[in-house]
A protein has these predicted regions:
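C-terminal and inter-domain tail/linker signature
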Residues: 1-129
Length: 129
């Protein structure tokens, strides 16, 4: 398995995201994001970017593990503080990215984070609607 392309794409993606740049350029035109616990599916580069921007605003203290790479895929495990209460409970998640032709073609999020951006309609300036 050659993980060279997935590593380059994901590194570029998180670099853009971390600098506040337009990470939608890392997505295929028909990209989709699926959050399984709420059944949310968001399609399109701009729509996925906006959804994730709102989602991240509602995920305090995100911590991630080292990224795992495979042929045409990358996997990120992490957790965030539960914003619903002041306990030390954390919400675990795993994101699986599909990668082809130098872009992210799909991403699937496993974990109970759907409530953080429940309807998929996110205004980048204000977070989930």
């Amino acid at each position: 398995m050659d993980a060279t392309e997935p590593r380059a794409v994901i590194t570029h993606y998180f670099d853009f995201m971390g600098r506040g740049e337009d990470f939608a350029t890392c997505y295929a035109e028909d990209v989709s994001w699926t959050t399984f616990d709420g059944g949310t599916v968001v399609s399109g580069p701009t729509e996925v970017r906006d959804y994730l921007t709102g989602l991240h605003r509602n995920m305090p203290d995100i911590q991630t593990r080292p990224i795992a790479y495979a042929d045409e895929a990358a996997y990120v495990e992490g957790d965030c503080a539960d914003p619903r209460n002041a306990s030390t409970d954390r919400i675990p998640f795993c994101i699986a990215y599909d990668i082809a032709n130098g872009v992210i073609t799909a991403a699937r999020c496993y974990g109970s984070i759907g409530f953080l951006a429940p309807d998929g309609r996110v205004d980048p300036a204000s977070g989930p609607s």
